[in-house]
């Protein structure tokens, strides 16, 4: 997948900056947080790892889904082109919603992915929501499992332990989570100009 660049025929918009953000308390999908602006939202820089920025265990030890959200708009003059949203990395599972509709899912926190927006855009502001799941297991890279809070270190549920789930990593580095690399919108022409190539014996 080629990295997008700004050219005479391509628009490039970087969505890096401060987004609205909320830890899922288990009701995010039930209450359809992706359909409307997040209530009582925190702010979170993108790109960044949310569990390495905020103080307290609520963020650092969060297990499950979080929601990122912001408004986007696309100039009218580029709507005749192919409009693409590109996420360079989201750890570890992403669901992208535009104006409340699911338009893309991606598993894997270390590779870029993209989705065309043309069929989902409306005039004016568009509500972009990216739901991110940080759960690791033996189908993810890196691999891991599920443990209860403190039980992994204590060998069982002891005094002061909690049955709150948490990731049990099978690796020796921090599990950075969230939208960890830039999110961009770029455009390309709908068609490629006809180009005639003539081969010669010299290979030129």
PLM features per residue range, with description:
Residues 10, 59-62:
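Short, solvent-exposed beta-strand/turn "edge" segments of beta-rich domains on protein surfaces
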Residues 1-12:
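N-terminal pre-domain segments of enzymes
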Residues 5-6, 20-25, 62-193:
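Accessory beta-strand-rich segments of carbohydrate-active enzymes
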Residues 13-21:
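Mature N-terminal segment immediately following signal peptide/propeptide cleavage
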Residues 30-40:
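Short Gly/aromatic-enriched secondary-structure transition segments
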Residues 196-204:
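Single conserved hydrophobic/aromatic residue that forms the stacking wall/gate
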Residues 2-3, 51-55:
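Short glycine/threonine/proline-enriched tight-turn/helix- or strand-capping micro-motif at secondary-structure
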Residues 22-31, 54:
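Short, solvent-exposed loop/turn elements at domain surfaces
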